[in-house]
């Protein structure tokens, strides 16, 4: 089954409408297609790329996808579009995350770390405070990834080394430092322990470093821990829907992976108030490894 469940629209910083992205998925021959727009951010997270479009436009995004689903409901020759979300992991705002997830009938939730604190990890001009600060940021990034995986709020951990995007060389230097891979392994183990699927993304192939997310060292850890994976394009343009999936499929197979596991919830998270209550208790407390059954 050829699936791409991590895509974006012009609701945020994508370039095309939900309908245009869907038609690109049909043209690409996808069997399963999902639209997973960025979740709205608190005002403190002033990312100029997309925060200005929210929260008002998110409702329109949901309506657009639901209209697409209704239109395609009787079509057996085309994939049924799914409503997903890329949830920004905001550990200082647990109620913001939980409240948002109760508002919409998502089929799946992708968890992402685009920030460490208020630091936007994808912006090159912000990585100017030296090696020691960068190494501390990498450590915090993977500590929070483990916490996200154990929270019970997400189905998928997306682009697991996205933090390398604007600091590629420095990130790989850090990975070679003693103890770094052990810290990453803690995050990967949290995925395995809590049934969170790891995304293998072709988006990194479109960056100057031309390396998938995640890098080989992390793929090896995922294979060792038996984490399930799914493939994704993280397309922000219709030309990238399904792009590079064949390449990352070969990459994943080289580590012994299959990728027929899909990150779909049997029911919407808002029907599971106990999960949200557990998540709030967990996020408001210290950092023990709690496990929540979805």
Describe every region a protein language model picked out.
Residues 1-9, 18, 29, 170-294:
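Charged catalytic cores and adjacent phosphate/nucleic-acid-binding surfaces used
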Residues 11, 106, 111-225:
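Domain-core and long-helix interface of multi-subunit machines
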């Amino acid at each position: 089954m050829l699936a791409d469940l991590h895509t974006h629209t012009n609701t945020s910083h994508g370039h095309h409408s939900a309908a245009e992205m869907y038609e690109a998925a049909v043209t690409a021959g996808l069997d399963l297609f999902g639209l997973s727009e960025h979740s709205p951010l608190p005002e403190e997270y002033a990312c100029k790329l997309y925060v200005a479009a929210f929260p008002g436009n998110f409702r329109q995004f949901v309506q657009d996808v639901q209209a697409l689903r209704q239109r395609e409901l009787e079509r057996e020759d085309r994939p049924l579009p799914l409503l997903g979300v890329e949830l920004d992991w905001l550990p200082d705002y647990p109620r913001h995350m939980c409240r948002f997830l109760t508002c919409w009938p998502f089929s799946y939730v992708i968890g992402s770390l685009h920030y460490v604190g208020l630091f936007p990890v994808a912006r090159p001009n912000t990585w100017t405070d030296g090696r020691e600060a960068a190494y501390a940021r990498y450590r915090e990034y993977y500590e929070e990834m483990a916490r996200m995986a154990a929270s019970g709020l997400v189905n998928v951990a997306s682009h697991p080394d996205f933090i390398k995007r604007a600091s590629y060389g420095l990130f790989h230097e850090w990975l070679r430092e003693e103890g770094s891979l052990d810290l990453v392994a803690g995050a990967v183990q949290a995925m395995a322990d809590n049934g969170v699927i790891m995304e293998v993304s072709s988006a990194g192939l479109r960056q100057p470093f031309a390396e998938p997310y995640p890098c080989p060292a992390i793929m090896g850890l995922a294979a060792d821990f038996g984490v399930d994976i799914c493939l994704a394009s993280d397309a922000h343009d219709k030309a990238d829907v399904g792009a590079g999936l064949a390449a990352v499929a070969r990459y994943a197979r080289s580590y012994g992976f299959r990728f027929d596991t899909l990150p779909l919830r049997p029911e919407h998270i808002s029907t599971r108030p106990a999960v949200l209550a557990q998540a709030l208790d967990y996020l408001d407390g210290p950092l023990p490894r709690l496990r929540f059954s979805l």
